[in-house]
Amino acid sequence: MPWNSEHTNWFFKIETNLKSKDGKEVCLLEYNYDLNDKTVLSKWAKHFRNHYCFDSEIDFLRNGTGLSRKDFLVQLKFPTEARGFGSGIRSGDFSEILVADYLEYILGYWVPRTRYGNKTIRDESTKGTDLIGFKLYDENKTTKDVLKMFEVKAQYSGNKAKPRLQDAIDDSIKDDLRKAESLNAIKQRLFDKGKTEEALKVARFQNQVDMPYTSEFGVAALYSNDIYDEDVIINCDTSAHPYNSALFLIVIKGDDMMKLVHKLFEIAADES
């Protein structure tokens, strides 16, 4: 399998009493990546690339285009680096995948990777809930099983921090309404890839009335350190969220994050 988790070792939890305006605790993480660690970056780039196009499928998909693997990815699959909305889509995709990795490899959820490979327009974001993670305890389909819906927002440029955590909270309010469509999309993409067993895991969560489980919600904001502002975080308010008691708040920050975003896309293409 192409997946790898070594880059999640660069997460460091900052001990803090950070809370929202209404008293919800905020988990604060520093992402201390190392651009000199070529081994980890290479494994991460492969992991990242396979969200857009599996290495096992790229030669078939590029057949007829006259493009090399690198050019196929750069010209047809990856969001553009500078044109139009491309840079913003790059940062958004990167941030969602990084939070998915934290959710899966640090917090222990299963997060299907189906969101980016079937884009029709590469410089557009995929509709629906940003991330869905699952915990299944056994085959008995107990109420302990967990479905966690996550919204992710990022800001890696600008002179002033925007309320990205509040934006994620506001978007998360709609997640329960989008759940059925998002689950169906994940299940269908898994089935289309021949991953029937994984598709059936998703099916377990499609009828909460007859097969109850625990619903959780999460929101994440990611910033570059040069614009991160704690005051913006503590002014966010979750009180309007209908599932406030089941809401997890996380902020991830790191140095020059947009540089990292572009570097990862570059390595992913170069090493394809």
What do these predicted regions represent?
Residues 137-145:
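Short, solvent-exposed loop/turn segments that connect beta-strands within catalytic domains
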Residues 1-70, 77, 265-272:
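Nuclease-adjacent, charged terminal/linker segments that flank catalytic cores
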Residues 158-228:
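Acidic, metal/cofactor-coordinating or nucleic-acid-engaging core segments within structured domains
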Residues 106-124:
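A short acidic/basic microdomain associated with nuclease active sites
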Residues 73-76, 82, 123-133:
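Charged, often glycine-rich, active-site loop that binds/positions anionic groups
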